């Protein structure tokens, strides 16, 4: 797409998402925004201070290792749901979908809302395995595809920043297992914050 086409597509999808949010507010659907991120065992520096001209050093022994985070934001419920792994592959995203089966999927004798999940066109979302997994859930899960170059349309991006800048920042983790546990604890704290304080996602960025 050329520049004008991209802008038009972003506007079109942005309007569709406004309509989806209205549907969620009316109780007609559950609206989920999905994406991946990662955290490192070395410190994430949300902010730092040093005298002018000083060489700022942060202790970070060894080689930094990462933990991948697969997540969805329940837009109306304001809840972040995260699974962790050592990689960001289609199989890891499908594991997240399997968790959504338990939380949002059909259950015998229970009426559940249709679910709309917002996804970008990243390779793990458009692989054959992932598309097959999404197709198998098409009777209750609808995908809204984001255009390329439009992270601003994915509401989970702000929450990822909040998680890393306010809950995981300025810490060194001894190994991926310790970081993994810290991620899940941080998600629990963040969700508690967001349930108590409706404007917490509007705080000033670090």
Regions found by a protein language model. Give the residues of each.
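Short, basic alpha-helical/linker "hinge" immediately adjacent to a nucleic-acid-recognition surface
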Residues: 1-6
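Extended, low-complexity cationic-aromatic segments
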Residues: 9-99, 204
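Short, well-ordered coil/turn elements that cap or connect secondary structure elements
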Residues: 26, 112, 136-140
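C-terminal anion-handling pockets and recognition modules
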Residues: 28-29, 156-206
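Structured catalytic cores of enzymes that bind and process phosphorylated ligands/cofactors
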Residues: 32, 96-110, 184
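RNase H-like polynucleotidyl transferase catalytic core
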Residues: 55-62, 135-158, 172
């Amino acid at each position: 797409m050329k520049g004008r086409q991209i802008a038009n597509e972003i506007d079109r999808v942005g309007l569709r998402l406004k309509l989806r949010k209205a549907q969620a507010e009316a109780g007609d659907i559950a609206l989920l925004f999905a994406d991946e991120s990662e955290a490192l065992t070395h410190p994430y520096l949300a902010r730092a201070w040093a005298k002018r001209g000083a060489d700022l050093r942060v202790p970070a022994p060894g080689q930094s290792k990462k933990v991948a985070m697969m997540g969805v934001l329940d837009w109306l419920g304001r809840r972040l749901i995260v699974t962790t792994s050592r990689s960001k592959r289609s199989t890891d995203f499908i594991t997240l979908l399997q968790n959504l089966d338990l939380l949002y999927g059909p259950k015998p004798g229970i009426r559940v809302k249709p679910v709309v999940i917002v996804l970008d066109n990243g390779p793990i979302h458009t692989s054959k395995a992932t598309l097959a997994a999404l197709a198998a859930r098409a009777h209750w899960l609808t995908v809204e595809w984001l255009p390329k170059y439009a992270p601003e349309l994915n509401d989970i991006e702000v929450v990822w920043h909040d998680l890393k800048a306010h809950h995981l920042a300025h810490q060194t983790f001894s190994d991926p297992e310790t970081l993994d546990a810290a991620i899940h604890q941080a998600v629990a704290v963040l969700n508690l914050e967001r349930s108590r304080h409706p404007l917490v996602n509007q705080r000033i960025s670090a």
